């Protein structure tokens, strides 16, 4: 009830502000339309001046894009619906303790300026030239960040991407084309007749051993092909050119894709003789070697009972316990708000660069193996993390699967977001007065 009274009081003050504005206008004998309430949304209101301001900005943007303007009534209806939904979500954020700190907002403003190739001062000047104050732009960005967090917290948990969906996506024609590799191969053949004598076998094996020995010494494969190979490509250094997977001779089909550039196969024997195949180069495909970190963390989030200050205080207390020698895994099980990792003692297993939100990713990179980070804040709340180990790994296949999962998640998220917005709109008390 206290929250309701405070919010209702805020709504009254908002309306009083509009009334004072009207009195000022009348004092200057200006004929203007009375600012009024155009929507009641639970215990908040939307004013006509807010509607006009948002509609004006949208019209300016449409003009810049040379897009025909819709009828005024249609535009106002759409904008009012947008403001109603924003009001509902901001009220949800207030109840859920979702905030954006000044430090996070400042960093976001810096990032926006950087993305536009400007310093922060230049960005402020550009806004001023467009008739927008930096403070109003800053608060609008804060509002958008808060709404985004409300949506993520509410909608993400409703989105599920199954392994079958990922696998089906990876089997699609577009995904296969993206994954296709090409191999630049070279080949040596030590030929044997159909029914070789013991002497012929012995001579062939002698050549094989010479080739193996010289390869171990670093002799160039092409030079060895010219010297020893009985294949028609010998004079070209055994070069088979670039081959797609389905163009690789069946004898090498299982071996060649597993070779790294510069690597030569073990001898391959068949009825025509003994073969060596070398991977000169690879191109295409999704091979990517990265440094992975084995990480565990503890997350403390804001909620109805814990505001940002309390969340920060709790993570600092947990950090103190870790520094005092208490077991990280047990503390994660007892305190972490990340239910999945908490059950595993905070373990996130092996994490690739870029898998996590930027704040987490940066702290993970900066924390030495075995060390525990100081408390830091991300969009999800307050964390501490420990880097348990690091390794290099080729994540090509996993990267493709991860990208497929992200594509599918985005598609489902957009669909589920619209469903969720409809639900919260239906569940809210909304009275339109336009």
Curated annotation (Swiss-Prot):
Signal peptide segment? 1-29
Q: Which organism is it from?
A: Hahella chejuensis (strain KCTC 2396)
Keyword entries, A-Z: Chaperone, Isomerase, Periplasm, Repeat, Rotamase, Signal
Q: Which Gene3D superfamilies match?
A: 3.10.50.40, Porin chaperone SurA, peptide-binding domain
A GO cellular component annotated for this chain's UniProt record is: outer membrane-bounded periplasmic space
What Enzyme Commission number does this protein have?
5.2.1.8
Q: What is this protein called?
A: Chaperone SurA
Instruction: Provide the primary localization.
Output: periplasm
Catalytic reaction equation(s): [protein]-peptidylproline (omega=180) = [protein]-peptidylproline (omega=0)
Pfam families per the UniProt record, alphabetical: Rotamase (PF00639), Rotamase_3 (PF13616), SurA_N (PF09312)
Q: Which residues form the PpiC domain?
A: 180-281, 290-389
